[in-house]
Swiss-Prot record:
Protein name, UniProt field: Asparagine--tRNA ligase
Coiled-coil positions: none
Name of the gene this protein is made from: asnS
SUPFAM superfamilies listed in its UniProt record: Class II aaRS and biotin synthetases, Nucleic acid-binding proteins
GO biological process: asparaginyl-tRNA aminoacylation
One Gene Ontology term, aspect cellular component: cytoplasm
Organism of this sequence: Streptococcus mutans serotype c (strain ATCC 700610 / UA159)
NCBIfam families in the record: asnS, PRK03932.1
Length: 448
């Protein structure tokens, strides 16, 4: 048999042709003289049909019967090389099927643990290395890939330079209770929570820069929105105001959604995602509301029948129920801007004329998906930044290089970070963030 394989996703370009595909058997059915194989190859799923008389006619009685019986008794996840004629099939969601003409077993599979029945979450997570092969998990990973691709495309088209921040840091520059500590040749080192501080150095050297990589937070949170290891897309850019930064962030998120619609429509279909809703998010301007106005809204509606959040006061941080209500109230992605300085990081620039508030924004995704972006305008004055570091009980020596940036041509600059898995969860419409990364790391989950 030929080794010149084509991908399932490309069979639409070979209607009426005999092709060879390398694939795995996701499921099978049939009886008597016909067998149906559900095949997958990582690009898509589709069906191959084998007719017993065709195999006997092509290979003779004995050999044809042997091949057909092999097909009928294939186990789930058997790897095969299959040849056949591509045909249109309007009954299928995929639109095509394969009229099988030959088949060869490449790799056997016995007692595959994830059978076509309901399994508990713990069982599926214990077998995550196999669960990734399922139709839904494949669709989510294709959406993740589309988001990453669209990110690189957006930053390239907008003049950004890829800048790689370190993952290991020699000081506990943030709250050590949220940091993972490791030994670095006899000295303590910490896994990065964010590449932002280093990225600001890149912005002062190269202008617009972005970073994409894993970050780590030792938060003992057991929610559907939290992971201890996840991927962040951070960006920093000089000579830009806070309002201009919000415009850039909005354009970025809309580009990511459009990128998934363009590159992974079949994946969205498998997940039954409401694509009209996604298109609405692209078409409409994102809402912008101040923190104080959002608090007032929450207070005004806290007695409504359909609310399930606790009372909140000005100066309090939002919980997940508050974020959900705010984004659902407006029905589109919503920037909450100008939080109290006491709730945010030391490096954020105060709102002019209101030092108790800072020039920052969290982008809340609708449908209960919560914060997907956090960003701010950064403090540019050396003395002000130094005072803030001390006010927060931090050691200025740990921020020597960061402070140094303010002494040599400091300029207005902004930045933001987008959590990849939260964005994927939102666009895919899935319920839990653990499915948005190949091998999730959570509280009490570090295997496989």
């Amino acid at each position: 048999m030929s080794k010149d394989y084509i991908s399932i996703i490309d069979v639409k370009n070979h209607v009426g042709e005999e092709v060879t595909i390398g694939a795995w058997v996701a499921n099978k059915s049939g009886k008597g003289k016909i067998a149906f194989l559900q095949l997958r190859d990582g690009t898509a799923f589709f069906q191959a049909v084998a007719f017993k008389p065709n195999f006997i006619e092509k290979f003779g009685e004995e050999a044809g019967l042997e091949k057909f019986n092999t097909i009928k008794h294939l186990n789930q996840e058997t790897a095969i090389e299959i040849k056949g004629i591509v045909k249109e099939d309007k009954r299928s969601k995929f639109g095509y099927e394969l009229d099988a003409t030959d088949l060869k077993v490449i790799g056997t599979s016995d007692n595959y643990p994830i059978t076509p029945k309901e399994h508990g979450t713990d069982f599926l997570m214990d077998h995550r290395h196999l669960w990734l092969r399922s139709r839904k998990q494949m669709a989510i990973m294709q959406i993740r890939n589309a988001v990453i691709y669209a990110s690189y495309e957006f930053f390239d088209q907008n003049g950004f330079v890829k800048f790689d921040s370190p993952i290991l840091s020699g000081n506990a520059a943030e709250n050590t209770t949220d940091l993972f500590e490791t030994d670095y040749f006899g000295e303590p080192a910490f896994l990065s929570q964010s590449g932002q501080l280093y990225l600001e150095a890149g912005a002062m050297a190269f202008g617009r820069v972005f970073d994409f990589g894993p970050v780590f937070r030792a938060e003992k949170s057991k929610t559907r929105r939290h992971l201890t290891e996840f991927w962040m897309m951070d960006a920093e850019y000089p000579f830009m105001s806070h309002e201009q930064s919000l415009d850039l962030q909005e354009a970025y998120v809309k580009t990511l959604i459009q990128g998934v619609l363009d590159r992974a429509p079949q994946a969205l279909g498998i997940l039954e995602r409401d694509t009209d809703l996604l298109r609405k998010y692209i078409a409409q301007p994102f809402k912008r509301v101040s923190y104080d106005d959002a608090i007032t809204l929450l207070q005004e509606h806290e007695e409504d029948e359909d609310t399930d959040y606790e009372h909140i006061e000005h100066g309090d941080d939002f919980g997940s129920p508050h974020e959900t209500w705010i984004s659902n109230y407006f029905g589109i992605p919503t920037f909450v801007v100008n939080y109290p300085a006491s709730l945010k990081a030391f490096y954020m620039k105060p709102v002019p004329g209101n030092p108790d508030r800072v020039l920052c924004a969290d982008l809340l995704a609708p449908e209960g998906y919560g914060e997907i972006i956090g960003g701010s305008e950064r403090e540019t004055d050396y003395n002000t930044l130094l005072a803030k570091i001390k006010e927060n009980g931090l050691n200025p020596d740990d921020y020597a290089f960061y402070l140094d940036l303010r002494q040599y041509g400091s300029v207005p600059h902004c930045g933001f970070g987008l959590g990849l898995e939260r964005m994927v969860t939102f666009v895919a419409g899935t319920k839990h963030i653990r499915e948005a990364i190949p091998f999730p790391r959570m509280l009490h989950r570090i295997e496989p």
